[in-house]
Amino acid sequence: MDISIKKHEHILKNEIFFIKTKWPHFDILFKGIKKIAKLSKNNKKVVILERTNLYGGISLFAPFFNLKNFISIDCITEKLKKRGAYNKKFLSSNKLIKIRSEHQYHYKKIKLKKSSADFIIIPNLLHHIDDPSILFKQVKRILKPNGFIFIFEPLVRELHQIPEDYSRFTPFGLTSTLKKFGFKNVSFEYSGGPFTCILYYWDQALQFIPKNLRKK
């Protein structure tokens, strides 16, 4: 891997997703992203559905791919537009590679051709979709026969990006839903357990304590 990409990944893991201290399950996301990046080198088309507006239109994962065969779509909504780029503050490091999303579409109207993508990545997005069935129909339409989708979703998470926080899928619920829409060979990986949940919610509780009192 290129040194600049390694630095980019390091910043994402440690200063945006905090995988060592807060969200360790995001390591699964990075493994999946890098695996698809390797598989897609031979002119395979990759589409990623994101909420890049939060970061000023910057795609966090575009640098991992060959941009000639990569499309980042900002799944924008009117509510998200009003909130603005409130996470852009995390992108101040000059070690980050900043590549903007090429397109902004509502998830119900993704303007890509039928059977045009070999891989579709949906990272940390599904719980912000009010009608997942429409999204899955869009994905099914865009994906080539024998194409591959990679979905990363949290099961345990506080309410966030309110009011656009709609649901949580278990691995089994998501598997069942995907099969209903005709997706085959569905598999999943998950991490964590009860102690991970306890630590996560303890971290959330600490946010309500003034910073000068937390160490005490």
Task: Report the location of each language-model feature.
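Class I SAM-dependent methyltransferase Rossmann-like catalytic core
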Residues: 1-41
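Surface-exposed loop/turn positions
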Residues: 44, 114-116, 146-147
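Receiver (REC) domain switch-region micro-motif
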Residues: 46, 120, 149
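Class I SAM-dependent methyltransferase SAM/SAH-binding core
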Residues: 47-109
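A short acidic, Gly/Pro-enriched loop at the edge of an enzyme's catalytic core
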Residues: 107-120
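A short SAM/SAH-binding and catalytic strip from SAM-dependent methyltransferases
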Residues: 118-130
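S-adenosyl-L-methionine-dependent methyltransferase catalytic module, highlighting the catalytic core
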Residues: 130-138, 148-216
